[in-house]
């Protein structure tokens, strides 16, 4: 038994050593972005830009991967290296996560605007995009705001967010709304600080386990390690809304043509995630829904081979 374990360890070390080293760097994006509606401060931010950390590998058409809340771009490890055999693959830490800069409290930005500015910084006009949960919500906004920048979008574990449409609200009403939400979030931060990050993260890990599928054991260590590394900035600071929410509904319904969108639903994912993807699929004419059996919320981690195969088939078809 010891010999078997030793051989497996050697195989793991050799496999890791054989992985190509990706290029890494930072792209600066504006601290306050053009489509943001949630900022509460009118003064200039302390820093005019925020830096987004990214890794890049491979050649060909550009593929950009967007991660889930509470983790970082490492969640794409298996998918990243598989796709890099055929494409120029880029993964980055969204603002507020991983090695990227944290947001400035009170200043509004959209994750979708960050993605657009990030692509501009890398000289990418159009790309294939994939996002999981937080990343999927970002792509829902991006498809609504920047459809001309999308070759294909693969969205999994969440799409249109639940934030109300504030785009047509009078400025004074919008200010009252933002100030009220900001005050409520300050109160949430106070409660979080009293409970402590260890307790909150332990509960969060349990919540992620409850919506994972049959392969949870295979991702548990890596997933929990990323959650442990997470700064939890969103729990310790009053966060502005980084999504357009229901505004995406009206934008998508007005679009005469839509970029091709693939929705990958994990069999054991939450009902809310499934509903948000089904809702967006109904608005996008060029969309397709597929279910990944035995997978839960973290489809790309739980079933990376199937995720890549389905994504590549969809890209090839368009």
Could you describe each region identified by the protein language model?
Residues 286-318:
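Catalytic active-site module of serine/aspartate enzymes centered on a nucleophile-bearing elbow/loop
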Residues 144, 152-189:
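Flexible "cap/lid" loop of the alpha/beta hydrolase fold
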Residues 187-255:
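Conserved alpha/beta-hydrolase catalytic His-Asp/Glu region
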Residues 57, 91-130, 134, 309:
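Active-site loop/oxyanion-hole signature of alpha/beta-hydrolase fold enzymes
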Residues 2-6, 14, 18-63, 86-87, ...:
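Alpha/beta-hydrolase fold catalytic core
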Residues 270-276:
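Conserved alpha/beta-hydrolase "acid-adjacent" motif
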